Amino acid sequence: MRVSEPSDVVIRSDDTCHIHLTWSGSECDKYPAKQHARKVAMKLGVSSGLIYLVGQPTVNWGDSDQPQPFRQRRYFYYLSGIDEPDCYLTYDIQADLLTLYVPDFDLRRAVWMGPTLTIEEAHKQSDVDRVNFFAALQHDLEWWTTKNKGTRPIYVLHDSQQPLIPSKRLWLDNERLLPAMNAARVIKDEYELRMIRQANYISGLAHRKILEDIHRMSTEAEIESSFLATCVSHGAKNQSYAIIAGSGENAAVLHYVKNNEPLDGRQLVCLDAGAEWRCYASDVTRTIPLWTDWPSERARNIYRVVEEMQEECIRRIRKGVRFRDLQLLAHDIAIKGLQKLDILTNDCTSAIYESGASAVFFPHGLGHHVGLEVHDVSKRPITALDGNQANWGNHNFVPLLTDSSWSVPLLDEGMVVTIEPGIYFNRLALLNAQNQPLAKYINFDEAEKYIPIGGVRIEDDILVTAKGYENLTTAPKGEEMLEIIRRGIDNS
């Protein structure tokens, strides 16, 4: 039986494709989808097969005719650069052909909601080879599978995203694509770094605006709304994650997002907020005094300990460094700082660390990758804790590190990681710690005096470079932060 050829989708093996790209003007902002597709194929280590990805579909809320806010699937975006719903993508590895499928034109939808993405618009946004309407997808997939007679696999991320092809000879591989894409995404290219820099730039503006106006604010909600307003006014309508604006004891809740309490009588506010730019994240945390200066000596002292933790860890970032070593360094500095404040006993720092006592005050990891996700993917966890990673936050607060943890992934050029140490005085955590063996290392009477402070966290996004690092975060901190607060009061 003669097999009909597809509508403009896959180059036959006996054809030759010549692609010539001229970069000029706004074309420099085209998403490098083709480069990413080739990178994923290289990580797969194969010379043939078809990568098949499904974009985020339009989905309504349960029992409602109202759509949920759209958020593109990040793996799909990595190979397409298209931030529109109901799209599909194929990449023929042997033919080196990347094809995007956009929704068919729907007049009724166009009248009510505006037209969907056109073929011309898609080509302007991304350097995909071809763009077709969705109506061609099924035919093109069947053509490809029939031509290859089940001798080459179709790579999918999940079983739920496999193509609906009526073929008994279909070879699906749902195991290899995800780790290959994770390995590709962990190293950022120049386009991605521009997006992350812009996200950080807008976040920096929003953090600075809050410092200028903090003396006028009376609630956590005002801080959140100010941050959002600055981001939206600069074109960043989406946040990388829910804004955390925790004042007082709320600053000791790592992912506090209620942001609905008054600031009156509070010493500090922990503001963890980062804008998103073209699907790329920023992740920025600043701890802000609600006074013209530090409201108490205790608040100042804790800030200085966390500041030292961050500065020393950032200073050591370079290609080839084990991130886990920075995690250990941060704990070592935290332990010594808390010993000086008589919060921890003067026992050996290694004994205190191994007991888990320092994790009562610093219960989370030092950082993570940043990219299309705020907690971006990688081939292996950055601290190599793997399945034990959850133990940083277990009820005993004991960081269970096995011998295998020493086989740690190294930092490499092009990675973007956060450095976000923190020290917290969480009432529930301290109460729980009193019943643990680690209690002998903690002076609870002294620690409880710090509960009104809540906690201090400082977080920057750091690019690993060939010779060291570049701090991508522009939000003020330390003495610069205090100067802006003072000027805001003087100018009011």
Swiss-Prot record:
EC number(s) from the headed UniProt entry: 3.4.11.9
Chain residues that bind Mn(2+) 2: D272, D283, E459
Matching InterPro entries: Aminopep_P_N (IPR007865), Creatin/AminoP/Spt16_N (IPR029149), Creatinase/aminopeptidase-like (IPR036005), Pept_M24 (IPR000994), Peptidase_M24B_aminopep-P_CS (IPR001131), X-Pro_dipept-like (IPR052433)
Family matches, as SUPFAM superfamilies: Creatinase/aminopeptidase, Creatinase/prolidase N-terminal domain
Residues at which Mn(2+) 1 binds: D283, E420, E459
Xref: Gene3D superfamilies: Creatinase/methionine aminopeptidase superfamily (3.90.230.10), Creatinase/prolidase N-terminal domain (3.40.350.10)
Descriptive protein name: Probable Xaa-Pro aminopeptidase AO090005001240
Provenance organism: Aspergillus oryzae (strain ATCC 42149 / RIB 40)
